Amino acid sequence: MGDMAKLVVELLVSDFAQSLKFYTEVLGFRQLYDRPEEAFAYLDRDGAQIMIVQHEDGDERSWIAGELVQPFGRGMNLEIEVEDVEALHASCVSYGARIFLAMEEKWYRRDALLLGVRQFIVLDPDGYLLRLSQSLGTRAVSGEPLNG
């Protein structure tokens, strides 16, 4: 079944079939296992792992700390590193997914380094923000290319 990540988010979804299709057919996740009787699936894309489960009102195992209203997942985004962000962006556009942040190149400082990414943010069917990014490498904060 492969290695399981040490941190995995479980996303409550309003339409399990639609969400499963989005994550597998549009974003390229593969299903590691499922529990059809619970409308649950454990998904993986190159080590990025998530669980999706159908939300049912009154389910005592939903672990909801407050009122659940759409869009779900407000206040956070999930960053998923991919090898070909352009192809994934094209897949999302072709599917008609809502792009929240257009494709951009962004450099983030980490101490004396800048880490570059090409990224965009898409909303899943329930409004969870997914930041899909591809590494552009590193460079010195001074702008000088790093040796190596």
Predicted regions mapped to residue ranges:
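Vicinal oxygen chelate
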Residues: 1-8, 30-83, 89-123, 133-148
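Conserved beta-strand-loop-alpha-helix junction that forms the acyl-donor binding cleft
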Residues: 12-15
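Conserved active-site tyrosine of GNAT-family acetyltransferases
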Residues: 19, 23-24, 92, 127
